[in-house]
Amino acid sequence: MPKRKVTFQGVGDEEDEDEIIVPKKKLVDPVAGSGGPGSRFKGKHSLDSDEEEDDDDGGSSKYDILASEDVEGQEAATLPSEGGVRITPFNLQEEMEEGHFDADGNYFLNRDAQIRDSWLDNIDWVKIRERPPGQRQASDSEEEDSLGQTSMSAQALLEGLLELLLPRETVAGALRRLGARGGGKGRKGPGQPSSPQRLDRLSGLADQMVARGNLGVYQETRERLAMRLKGLGCQTLGPHNPTPPPSLDMFAEELAEEELETPTPTQRGEAESRGDGLVDVMWEYKWENTGDAELYGPFTSAQMQTWVSEGYFPDGVYCRKLDPPGGQFYNSKRIDFDLYT
């Protein structure tokens, strides 16, 4: 603390000087609590108030704080509420609980009251190093490969799904069937995996289909998946045909467009016998519901659904299945061709 030398007249020479210690203002740690003098509102002048008090290092962390009792005009707490309306007294009690004011009236929140993230506190930032340039982060597919889940081709995924689905059954229905108690009504056959294994395999195949962008795979039926497999040019569900189909000769004479679009009876039979019990339903239609109206077809269910979706039949047409012959005609607006694909 600074010391001041005071000389009393008639007591002695300058050598007989007494040292009188004058106390400074009390320094209060802002973290220790609220209270203490030094306010600009009720502060009393000391003997050395006109002198500089920066005798310390100049970087001290202690400073004068404002006590709540140093603020004039505060009200004491009365009733908490009246008539359902909350009454808040005019005082700094809540502010003092969460922080403090300095002598200049600036408000500071307590450090302990600040919200902390436990997850960030548990991170050891020393161990985290900057990733070297050129090193890319492993993707989700690579992480799955490291866990033993190898990526499969689209053909392998569809073939695996067809092995686990029943006719007219969706992927979601198969998951419910395999996940039920007992894994379905059918018993486990010789060499057939158990229901939990089939459930895990079906779930993994469906997840890979979703990862490839097919978000509606859980609502697709076995027949729809078989049509998609046929679209890939694969015929793995039926018996293997060693003789390849005849191809068109580029030097041959031009064929009529009707011959290319209209399937022959042989092609029709191959389409029906292709697959494990899968039958491609063929349709024929006419524009008017009269006996002498011209018939068009046959066409596949997928082709009919495409025309309906694109609005080629705004008023609807009268169509019927090709098999059995001589069936009744129905309006296309009442038929959902997706059920037959």
UniProtKB/Swiss-Prot annotation:
GO molecular function: ribonucleoprotein complex binding
Covalent cross-link site, Glycyl lysine isopeptide (Lys-Gly) (interchain with G-Cter in SUMO2): K26
Domain of life: Eukaryota
Biased composition (Acidic residues): 49-58
Localization, UniProt: Cytoplasm; Nucleus
Positions of the GYF domain: 280-338
GO terms for cellular component: cytoplasm; cytosol; fibrillar center; nuclear speck; nucleoplasm; nucleus; U5 snRNP
Major localization listed first in the record, in broad terms: cytoplasm
Residues with N6-acetyllysine modification: K44
PANTHER family, sorted: CD2 ANTIGEN CYTOPLASMIC TAIL-BINDING PROTEIN 2, PROTEIN LIN1
Quaternary assembly: Component of the U5 snRNP complex composed of the U5 snRNA and at least PRPF6, PRPF8, SNRNP200, EFTUD2, SNRNP40, DDX23, TXNL4A and CD2BP2. Interacts directly with TXNL4A and PRPF6. Interacts (via GYF domain) with CD2 (via Pro-rich sequence in the cytoplasmic domain). Interacts with PQBP1.
Known function: Involved in pre-mRNA splicing as component of the U5 snRNP complex that is involved in spliceosome assembly.
Protein name: CD2 antigen cytoplasmic tail-binding protein 2
Provenance organism: Homo sapiens (Human)
Gene of this entry: CD2BP2
